[in-house]
Amino acid sequence: MKQKKNNVAIIGGGIVGSLLALILGLNGLKITVIDRQKKDKLFSKNHYVKSYALNQGSSNLLNILNIWDIIKTKSQPIDKILLKQGSSISSIQPFELIFSNDYSKNNYLFHMIEEIYLKKAIVEKIDKCPNIEYLYSSNVVEQFIDKNSTKLVLDNGQIIYSDLIVGSDGYPSSSAKKAGIQHINYSYNQSSIVGIFKHEIPHESEAVQIFLPSGPLAILPLSGNRSSFVWTNETNEAVRIFNLNDLNFLNELNTAFQNRRGQIQLESKKSMFPISLTIPKKVIKERFVIIGDTAHKIHPIAGQGLNLGIRDVAALAEVLILSRRLGEDIGSKLVLNKYSKWRNLDVTSVVFFTNFANKIFSNDNFLKKFATGIGFKLLNESKTIKNYFISEASGLSGDIPKLLKGCKL
């Protein structure tokens, strides 16, 4: 029976878990990543339908890791964001709000990247790092944690000892459950359909989010005449739309999108997943910590889920690396509390904002629409407020980790 001792064992090989492994491995820590996915699926285009809007902080981190140069040619900058009311009520004028790169310190607002290209670039870097052992097609069957060490038993009989376990296996999380971490879960009774389509009319680097009564529809530009869509509806309606044949689905999508891109055609398969707000009662225990979707699932209305997870990665990596250099026990609560306290305000703020935005914008109540319309009119005329929102969305405000500033640890 094979046994191994490492500094950190990471359960879950998604983008967040893989990024953490790479940063820690490049800084001298011995890492094991346990991923239930098969390796051949990682590079199968049919396996991926998601795309991500990376903010400046996330791009800075990827640049430090020399990943940005690999994916840059596959990325698509967003120069303009249009927020638009999808339906008017009574005599209320539908609102529109426009953000352009004039409000950004850079010449873009976000960069769109398809999940497959980002994951492939990270894995290629991991494969070249001798400090990282990446175990594919592996599942944890037993998880033991005591005051001095941790032990994981895999389904192939392999045993892994480590100073710290990081749960990055999404939600619901088997690792968090085994560690005794409980989550508070609130269902929005909504589901999102995601995918990629080709279109006739160029997007001109414009992202559009249309607020419909049953949920938001986001159309996000990709390289070429292609865009990613995230279409959120009440679950019953989402199921109906998802089960349509491709022709009828595209007709309904184009109608909801107000035919802004002309003729459209599906490029990827489409996928659907339920939307919920999920937060843990705590993110750390002795020798155990959770990050990414395992620590917080938020509404996709602002497209900030991955950026929030990357901020987790940057903060945890900085805490662990600097603590290890000081000779501290990286699995101790003393060290992990630094991470927990650092991330609390940011996560709470994003959770509150996304929850509030969904309730306000996806509501057919007359008074709420009226108030929203007035608010957006005032916001559209205020450069100061727009600058504030762009600054917050950039991931560069507040007490941020060094990696998000583009600084090495």
Q: At which residue positions do the language-model features occur?
A:
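Conserved Rossmann-like nucleotide-cofactor binding loop
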Residues: V16, K39, P172
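Glycine-rich FAD pyrophosphate-binding loop
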Residues: G25-K50
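N-terminal Rossmann-like FAD-binding beta1-loop-alpha1 element of flavoenzymes
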Residues: N6-V33
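N-terminal FAD cofactor-binding segment of flavoenzymes
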Residues: N46-S88
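C-terminal helical "tail/cap" subdomain of flavin- and related membrane-associated enzymes
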Residues: E318-L409
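Conserved N-terminal helical subregion
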Residues: Q3, N63, S75-K178, Y186-S191
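Conserved FAD-binding catalytic core of PHBH/FMO-like flavoproteins
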Residues: L62, Y161-Q263, E267-K270
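FAD/FMN-dependent oxidoreductases across multiple families
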Residues: E237-L326, I330-L334
